[in-house]
Design a protein with these regions (language model features):
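Phosphate/ribose-recognition catalytic cores of enzymes acting on nucleotide-derived substrates
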Residues: 1-90
Length: 90
């Protein structure tokens, strides 16, 4: 269950007992017209399929609020800035 507020987070993900640094977005994805609340996580240094596997995500630190971007390019640019910032924190 998720009780955190919407936003972008520095996070940690556990897959099959291995722990990875990660970046997560909790919210409704307003830039792409999303309405359902969901958690999306990018796991740094992980490659492979996760479909059908159990995974644990821990939200460690909120980086910023979720917001709507006018273009997908603006969204991509912000995601890269968030990624760089989070990697500097670890």
């Amino acid at each position: 269950s998720v009780t955190a507020e919407d936003g972008v987070y520095r996070s940690r993900a556990e897959v099959d007992g291995a722990v990875y640094d990660a970046m997560s977005n909790l919210g409704r994805n307003p830039s792409v017209g999303g309405t359902a609340r969901r958690l999306e996580t990018h796991i740094f240094g992980f490659s492979g399929a996760l479909y059908g596997r159990m995974l644990r995500v821990e939200l460690l630190e909120k980086i910023r609020d979720e917001r709507r971007f006018d273009t997908l390019e603006e969204l991509r640019t912000q995601i890269e800035k968030d990624r760089e910032y989070i990697l500097k924190l670890k």
